[in-house]
Amino acid sequence: MPTASPRASARSRRADAVSGMPLTLDAALADVAAEIDRQFDQLLAIPDDPRADLYRAMRHAAIGGGKRLRPLLVFATANLFDVARECSARAATALEAIHVYSLIHDDLPSMDNDDMRRGKPTVHKMFDEATAILAGDCLHALAFEVLADPATHADPFVRIELVLDLARAAGPNGMAGGQIMDIEAETTRFDLNTVTRLQQMKTGALISASVEAGAILGRLPPEGRVGLRGYAHDLGLAFQIADDLLDAEGDEAVAGKKLRKDEVAGKETFLSLLGPERAREQARMLVDQAIAHLHSYGKEADLLRDIARFVLERDR
């Protein structure tokens, strides 16, 4: 008897509730994407003054497109602790604002010099370079404005911890530090340990912050977050290996962005250092490890498990 593919089984299974709504993985992805678009639409209303193009640029980058994986991780983790939907939505929007700001700046001529992102022109192509820089700056600021607002959580200590954790994830010991290492990789040969550290910072830090945000909203004490942190760590590395494979083997029309950039730039990646088969094997092992970290949560963590499997199967 033929068996269903892992992709089909993960996506058709009834996953646990996202803020009280029982959803399949596909439905959860769609629901969170719509919620994040709604949040950005409210936060980025276009003013009738000279700042209008700045807001249009932010909306161009932030609304529509993208996997919304980081926001989904916030929702799925917060749901373990019955966090109110609006609290999860605001924290998830802040995480996505940081991610989108990083994409805007990453696409600039001084960085990756990309023309397409999420299937549409990059912000500096649609507007201009100065507007793109400022749009990224504003989304960066917006993230912390949202987290610091009492509407995100009534407890000021929860809000402070959210701000602190995201600041660390986005700064020189996280995403920005990983980005400068990625630039150095164009002229310096990195070994596997250095590439792993680079990707833990550039990609993994924000994925970890997304899971951490859900735990913070749920007021889970730090000593209770060991399993979730292990899940996020392994998921982040698996995500990057899958991204390296997608960059080398994917379809640009489906991915909505330019591919094979790392090979052209001569950068060492998990794929170049391990080869395709070992890289796939490593990604599968990391996903299995990530799922194992969730053993204490039972069926309530099925959505997080499905997200881990989805990371290996995505095509964009």
Predicted regions located by residue number:
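Local alpha-helix boundary/kink/capping signal
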Residues: 8-12, 77, 296
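Mg2+-dependent prenyl diphosphate-binding active-site environment of isoprenoid biosynthetic enzymes
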Residues: 31-35, 44, 48-292, 299-312
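N-terminal amphipathic/basic leader segments beginning at the initiator methionine
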Residues: 2-44
